[in-house]
Amino acid sequence: MGKGLEGTAARCGLGMGYLLHSVVLPALAVLGASRPGSAAQDDDFFHELPETFPSDPPEPLPHFLIEPEEAYIVKNKPVNLYCKASPATQIYFKCNSEWVHQKDHVVDERVDETSGLIVCEVSIEISRQQVEELFGPEDYWCQCVAWSSAGTTKSRKAYVRIAYLRKTFEQEPLGKEVSLEQEVLLQCRPPEGIPVAEVEWLKNEEVIDPVEDRNFYITIDHNLIIKQARLSDTANYTCVAKNIVAKRKSTTATVIVYVNGGWSTWTEWSACNSRCGRGFQKRTRTCTNPAPLNGGAFCEGQNVQKIACTTLCPVDGKWTSWSKWSTCGTECTHWRRRECTAPAPKNGGKDCEGLVLQSKNCTDGLCMQAAPDSDDVALYVGIVIAVIVCLAISVVVALFVYRKNHRDFESDIIDSSALNGGFQPVNIKAARQDLLAVPPDLTSAAAMYRGPVYALHDVSDKIPMTNSPILDPLPNLKIKVYNTSGAVTPQDELSDFSSKLSPQITQSLLENETLNVKNQSLARQTDPSCTAFGTFNSLGGHLVIPNSGVSLLIPAGAVPQGRVYEMYVTVHRKEGMRPPVEDSQTLLTPVVSCGPPGALLTRPVVLTMHHCAEPNMDDWQIQLKHQAGQGPWEDVVVVGEENFTTPCYIQLDPEACHILTETLSTYALVGQSITKAAAKRLKLAIFGPLSCSSLEYSIRVYCLDDTQDALKEVLQLERQMGGQLLEEPKTLHFKGSTHNLRLSIHDIAHSLWKSKLPAKYQEIPFYHIWSGCQRNLHCTFTLERFSLNTLELVCKLCVRQVEGEGQIFQLNCSVSEEPTGIDYPIMDSAGSITTIVGPNAFSIPLPIRQKLCSSLDAPQTRGHDWRMLAHKLKLDRYLNYFATKSSPTGVILDLWEAQNFPDGNLSMLAAVLEEMGRHETVVSLAAEGNY
């Protein structure tokens, strides 16, 4: 009724006095008369209204200084609602579209001393009974209507609800037993209540504050997460829900952090316990590293080990019997002897005591004395001379033997040098020709190419894999060229054989292309085709490297308020920038840097880059690596093994990966094949010269990782070389089966062309392809036409993995001397925009995004919140990452923006929201003109 009256007054231009006297008062009288027993009350109501009202004074519309606030009735206590407006002659409350009787109003009027305007303040009291008597889907509400001579003003609606908090928790925490440093999740869903209950956690009846103890984290769903369980975290945990009505406690959940026992190191072996004969030695260990705690498992195994030992018994020595006395000597003595061998002392036994020799006089002291003879002196002199002569002869013989041995050793050195094929160091004599008994064998059916083998030979003896000098050399590259004829190739024809594999290159072309390599390597450092940069503030934006599949999404709010960052994203193409990989590992993405390093971000950015893996997680172990500055490459996270402390989240789509991170650095994705069924995608691209004035025509077959940047690099390289794309590139699934890649050419018109490859096919070794670390890997097929009048080449090229998949290219090339123009259908000429700043970078308008976040961030009892949104968008592989963010919905929408850039599939998003029952958001999308 009030709305109709006000509308009438506004349309007719009537004063408020006339409106109240002619319309409002009679209507109120009729309403009063319709209620029995209320006549006297209505008379009082009319008497209290003023007799006259001022008409059309120059006053403004009423302005509310105080508007009614939402209130909750606790138990049976009524609540008061207040309104205050100026200038206002009257203020009345309207509750649930019905006017509140004047007698229920408490009115206070005064005149503002400063402005001279009437200030009116009114309050009413709402009881529990009034709220309970209301029927219908809408809650009990009241609003104020203020009058002045200029018109009426309505306040906002204030809802009055009966506060309550149910006793039963919807989900209570459960006790757990966990090992040390394990992540613990305690779930809690508070009981239903109005207003919504606040949740806190108690540990042994003390409130947990995650700010003080960062090992605890309370999610937006009220769950408690213990990041790494400690022994001190063994306690009783209680979930507490409270509002203005009551405080409820859940059942206590006991968390026990146990420690499994671990063995200490073994002690040294003890000495053998037997001093003589068989015994044993032992060593021990204890279950104290660590000792089991809180029910942890005891160490498995024995704590004592014993081994048999044998200690030899000591044997004391004993004398043998004395020998017979010797004959009487010239000095009138004779002697006898004995030995300590019956038995000899062993194993530490005692030695014999006493004399070994015993002598005594054999003539009873009657011994003759003879004068010295001069013959004895001559005898002694002769003996000395003989000894000296023997020593001299020995020295001469020794010198002769030494010289003979030295000469033979020198001959051995000369002989060994002959085995080097004639490449002797300086100052060493040439080898004797008679030592080259066996000539080199040139009858093998395969010719091998290895870079280091030909370091001392002429360049013409090499069998190159490619004739393109602009490409970086491939170290230790080996290619087998299989000859079907099996004929022996003479040594003097080796140079001609190698020249048949690739065309001759003039010296001037070689020098020019070498110069191009140098210029290109310098240009790569600042190549704008590999880098995008821009200046961003808190509004965010998007950096895109055209035609490379690499971009960086900076969400709104990622850059702190009030700061401006010069940000960039770049692709590194130098092989030295790539992470080292092991035999079974492969590089799946380009190496991408984003910066500036160390920049403070308040929410994750999304780094997007193409990958070449067939993402079957049963066959792969995929991990993200990063490099800080010039330091070593470090592991960040293994996909599928994330935990609460993981700093990044990886969304792996069929062709691209999206990395959510708050750390700007250098990143790359590395895969390790678990089974031989693991496969990576290769992009096969075939190029030929734009114009050809010679008889030779070269076809280059590139085998690249199936990423946009790898193909873009080759297209740029061929453009510089004057090459053209001969056929649409094709994809090949290359399995980790260790089988090589085989390339062959077929169906050549032999009357017009001949192949200069003296083999049936070429092969690229498996690991050269699988590692993903060799850029621009390719093979060259050289054909020769018999006449310059031949202007067309028709043939087939087959590329396949041995015992695997393959692709066939049907080539129909035009060969002419004049350039026909280069067409690169892969290069998107429209993709020149690299930087988008502000709201234009995002598909979802900011107001709708804010509305989505405010409605989906809060957990819902039916689950119609951000978790369902992640599930519907297939982004629910690891929900705990989003749960740790202040706005999980915002991070999910950031990831959706990166996935659907640049088209922005809003129709799909609207359909998902429609399924979730978010009709108002779908209507908002339609109103924005984006749906």
From Swiss-Prot:
Residues 530-664 form the ZU5 domain. Residues 62-159 form the Ig-like domain. It comes from Gallus gallus (Chicken). Residues 1-39 form the signal peptide. This is Netrin receptor UNC5C. InterPro entries: DEATH-like_dom_sf, Death_dom, Death_UNC5C, Ig-like_dom, Ig-like_dom_sf, Ig-like_fold, Ig_I-set, Ig_sub. Keywords: Cell membrane, Cell projection, Developmental protein, Disulfide bond, Glycoprotein, Immunoglobulin domain, Membrane, Phosphoprotein, Receptor, Repeat, Signal, Synapse, Synaptosome, Transmembrane, Transmembrane helix. One of its GO terms (biological process) is axon guidance.
